[in-house]
Amino acid sequence: KEPALYEIYLKRKLTKPVILRFLPHFSEFCIYGGYPRVALSATREEKETVLKNIYNTYFLKEIKEILNIQEDYKLSKLINALALQIGNVINYNELSAITGLNHGDLLNKMNILEKTFICLRSLPFHTNKRTELVKAPKMFFLDAGFRNTVIKNFQPVSQRQDKGALYENFAASEICKKGFDVKYWRTKSKAEVDFVIEKRGAVVPEEIKSH
């Protein structure tokens, strides 16, 4: 990607015809993600097969073997639970009940999912950085296709009940890819801003809409 051209592209005002041409590709990305082999697959069936193979070899086999994870079924339960609640603030008590993991084991397994580039964590924005670390995070998936493989749902975006979560997950992943920390903001009365980006000393709030 040539840097100067990319900067020009970022400053372009997208016209409606361009947006309409782009939308089908965006919707497909929200369902199948961006793994190269998946993106290059010609049909939906082929994309789904490749994603299932990635899940079965990378997650179900390699990660568990390399890290020598005991009681691996609990990790599978955890990733399923996280996939079903992307964009929601983590409730550790609920996750413990679902997975059978205690609080310490939960944190350990969530760290593993981050370090193996499966999930990413969104911390609550706070001016006191120490406070950020002790508050409950949200969890997203770096690749939407991997997440949809976990929950076994490849329906088109237009037919999805979790459309808002798919868009929010896309935004979280792109923010992370651009080198920013992924954070959200929430008041005690539960008013919320989806993302807060700290850029060159400025704080930029971002709200994701699905309509």
Where on the chain are the PLM-derived regions?
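Amphipathic alpha-helical segments of the small helical/lid subdomains adjacent to P-loop NTPase cores
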Residues: K1-G34
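Active-site ExK catalytic segment of metal-dependent nucleases
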Residues: A202-H211
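Accessory nucleic acid-recognition modules appended to NTPase machines
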Residues: A39-V203
